[in-house]
Amino acid sequence: MDQDKVAFLLELEDKLAKIRSQVNSKLENQKHIAIILTAVEENIAGQATNDVSKNIVNYIISFMSLLDQAVDPSTHEIKDIQLASSSTYLLDLIFHYSPKVLLRSKFSEILTKIAPCITAEKANAPLIRAAIGCLESLLIAQDAQAWNNTYDLNVTPKRGLQGILELSLDVRPKVRKRALDAVHAVLLNPPVAPTAEHVAAVFVADFCDKQLAGILNDLSNLSNKQLKAQKTKEDINASVMRSLRLITSVVSTGQWPSSQIEPLCDVLLGVTKSSEQYLVSASFECFESMFKTMAETTISSGLAENKYLRVLDTIFALKPSNVDTLLTKSWIAVVIKGMSTYATHQPLKALRKIPGVFHIMCTYLASETPEVYQAASQCLISILSESVKDDLLLYTPSVDEKVFKNVDEIISQIAKTFIDFLSIRYSHCSREILKILVAAFNKFRYRSNPHFLKSLKIVDTWRVNEEQFMDLRNEIELVIGASISAMGPEMILAEAPLNLDNPSSERPGRAWLLPLIRDYTKNANLATFQNELAPYIKSFQSKFDKVPEESIQLRVFQTIVDQIWSTLPRFCELPMDLRESFTDEFASELSSLLYSEVELRTTICHALKVLAESNVSYAEESSSHNVLLLQRFPISEAQKNIEYLSTKSTNLLAVLFNVYTQTTPNARSYILETIDQYLKITSKEDLEKTFNNVCGLLKNSMNEESSGNVNKEKKKPQLTATLLDLIICMITYLPVSSYSALFSMFSLTVNSADALIQKRAYRIITKLSELKSGSTAVAQFISDIENVMVDSASSVQTSAKAARLTAIKTIVELLPLDHLDFIVRTVAEVILSTKDVNEKSRETAFDTLICMGRKMNEPNGIIKLFQIPGYDPTTPDQSSSISEFFKIISAGLIGESQHMVSSSITGYACLVFEFKNELDSGILMDIYDTIELYLTSNSREIVKSAIGFTKVCVLGLPEELMRPKVPELLLKLLRWSHEHTGHFKAKVKHIIERLIRRFGYDYIEANFPEEDRRLLTNIRKMRNRNKRKDEEVTTGVSDVAATKGSRFMSAFDEAVYGSDEENDNGSDQEENVAGGKMKNGAKQFIVESGDNPLDLLDSQTLAHISSTRPKKFNKNQNRARFNDDAFNFDSEGKLVVKGQPKPSTNVDDPLSAVTSGINAYLEAVKSGPVRGQRNKLKFRKNGKDSDEFGDDDDGEKDSRLMRGRVNQGNKIGKHNKKGPKFKSRKKL
């Protein structure tokens, strides 16, 4: 016996063993089956042999005899339903593993015995499902002769299959599912025959077609009255759905015969006319299953190729009328699915059919019905996007010469169709035609040239003739933009030149093309900018001096020049000719402009950055999905470009460094980003040389500063800080040999009196530690760095504290375990910083403190006490631990100043919250007892910190530790319950509320001092009141409260500074909110206008009832306030949302909002000066479309307005808050 057969029979044994184990099951049906199996196996135990086939036969005979006992032989009615179900279930299992010869020879006898289990009235779903399984195994075992009935059987296999097909339409879901699985399995296992098609395939397909066609016929014959009966309609729809599921199951086997394809398509398209969406969806699933199966069969064997084409041809032949909206949309969806599936498996053959699809869709695009021509346009867009594979669009030698010519011919045919589309015949759907053209350019890319040039010329004439085609301007510009991306700006400029210098009717000006070139250019030739656009810059700049200074013409010229410069970054995005066009001459020209033209620095720096960045990112891509770009511009070209740019980087960096030093600090982050990009591609030798040059400049700057020239020339310290910025930027790319110079620089600048220099000194350590090699270097010089950090503590500038604390945290993380004395020497400074006025310093101090605690808690740590000032040199080393760290901090509790004591308590609060689980409870309680004493201090600063610490303990420490401390804590806290300064009363009240919640009201009441009972009573009443309101509050208020986020950045902040106001039921805030909602909930308002008084008898009255007070508006009130492009108010005060403008593609580009030369001209006219009264020049005040003008007396008017604002209501006038200061994106 072979291995597969052994595994097959072992699988049967496993299933029988599982049934045997259910003999004690609580489910009666499982238990009965197990008992039957056990009884049968005991009966045949004496007949068991080594021949497994004979054992299977014994099982079949036994179970068949039991089935005979359960069925009445004369009436064929079932006498014992349970015995019949168990026997049939076991037969279903055994038949699956039985020899096919046996089932084939006994087919008629077995089928006759199993038939009553399906046809009897008493047959339930489990019995029918088991009988279907038996019938499935029987039918799979039959050969072609049996199916064709050459044996002259009384009951043929087709009769059994028909029974299963009828059950596949049964109303019972589980029976139907089992029958569908059986049909699927039978068709997937055809008998051996000359053809791969199952003998019964035509029979099954005919049954499916007739069944669905009959139901649809019944549906069409129903009267309107019957259709209105919901039950009748639902029953028919359910029957359609069951038939569709059967068809899908059959089609998915790949056995649907070719002769039945046309009737199937016809009937499925009939279903798509239904108004029920789920039926339409199910019919599409049938189509999709058919397409998918045929395509897979075509790939595997090639047998279904003609069948698939026949299906597509049938669908095209069944095209509906171009006025039938519903059917047309459904039919088009089937076309899309068929073409996309075909293209997945046969890309070239699918591409050959696309011109035919365009020809067919002409009929529907010519339709005057919007739904029809919109559906047709979406069809063509989808087919272009999904059915044209990029691999076919490659040039030779990547594709065969014959394929290349074939594809070229197909593209040419499609392009000719577009020329017809752009004719007057399709003028009603021009917008849709232009969208299809955009999809064509996006798909064919470089292959669009030269086939689509005629279409482009037609669209260009539309754009030039702006008056006639104004409503299509956006779509036209999308087409031209797509053509720029596809064929490159050089081809577009050749066909549609700018003509900016001397426009005329024969040579129309195309200033509107500049924003399109800016937005759509990519992977173009940099030479196009140099040869086509740059000459216009010089031409227009030469005209600046020839026109009046404040004239509109000058503003138009400046706008054009700005637009031309805005295209440079896009030409620098992975250019095709970088090595040929980015010459020394061009680079030096850009460099001189960086020095001379301040307003161009952003654009030129962005262009230089993109030039390097695009090549680096492209070269680092392991695999690109854009096969067309890969062929046109291989990755090796990008690598050559990087090597070429690296030879220019030294000079470019020198220019950028100089420009950086000349630019104000709040407006030069973009220069640093460009510098960073070129540092990345600079060779190690050049980088080291550049670094040495900067170090030399830094040394000179520092020498001049120290020699006293700083008093004469205030910019020198600024220069030092600027050079340090550059050095910090270079750290990431420096070789290890330069690290010693960095450490020297750090030690020289860390004690500088200038805060900017000091901050950058500390950032050297922080930046260096981010690198793996840098961390190693810091660890190597850790002793020297520690000494420098400790010695420089006295000279720290206030604004440099945060940078210093970050450096300390970095050093602590890198400390060796025998250098923990550094923590002891710097912890006092960190603790004091927890009370710093600067928020960033405070947050960094807390992070550093926690980092120190974790370092001290590491095993095998050693504190060398003799190295700490004040300790005897013979003092032995001390092992580190978190407990030892807490003891070290305790020295701060007896500090000389109140500020030190307060800071130490705050530090303890942070550390207890973080390390409460690692710390010994005895030490925790000692610290608590000590700090609790400070609640009796006369210093409010100390008490405030102590209250915060006790709150952390109350919330975080175990209940058994805190319960004994509560009585004494209450006495000390209540000393401050009458103190309003510094919110002491509120803080004490919140802690008591927390205590009540944690230890219970009774326990707190028992330990509460008698003289302060009023406070406790107040808290109790408030809690009870809030509980009652919680029960009454609406769901809406609960949702609002639930969605409110936490105001705190960390759990520690919430514990220390949070209160019941944020998350307790007993909060005053929630009480106010709930109370306010409840009080105002009953208020309602009637909205009416003077013209239309409210009719209380009208059915629409409820629409005029509002829960908020309506605003009254008149036509002239706040007119400017509502003059907005996005919003407006109607006569009743309701907000009306207009169309929002599309977001700009380039936020940083100030010219991105200018979409065309005409717009730029109008903008210049609007914002230009006009002559007012007394011949004074007036300018518009705001940048929008306001009609207000200002003149020389504006300042006086503003002062009068301000005085009126200040004096109004006898209140002090407050200026509006200014916006946030500019923050550099590049952090140093």
UniProtKB/Swiss-Prot annotation:
The gene is RRP12. InterPro entries: ARM-like, ARM-type_fold, RRP12, RRP12-like_dom. Present with 8170 molecules/cell in log phase SD medium. The keyword Phosphoprotein applies. In association with GSP1, required for nuclear export of both pre-40S and pre-60S ribosomal subunits. Required for the late maturation of the 18S and 5.8S rRNA of the pre-40S ribosomes and for maturation of the 25S and 5.8S rRNA of the pre-60S ribosomes. Residues 1212-1228 have a biased composition (Basic residues). It comes from the Eukaryota. Residues 1168-1228 are annotated as: Disordered. Belongs to the RRP12 family. GO terms for molecular function: mRNA binding; RNA binding. GO terms for biological process: maturation of SSU-rRNA from tricistronic rRNA transcript (SSU-rRNA, 5.8S rRNA, LSU-rRNA); ribosome biogenesis. One of its GO terms (cellular component) is cytoplasm. It is found in: Cytoplasm; Nucleus, Nucleolus. SUPFAM superfamilies: ARM repeat (SSF48371). Interacts with GSP1. It holds the Pfam family RRP12_HEAT. The modification Phosphoserine is found at residues 1059, 1067. Its main location: cytoplasm. This is Ribosomal RNA-processing protein 12. Keywords: Cytoplasm, Nucleus, Phosphoprotein, Ribosome biogenesis, RNA-binding. PANTHER family: ARM REPEAT SUPERFAMILY PROTEIN.
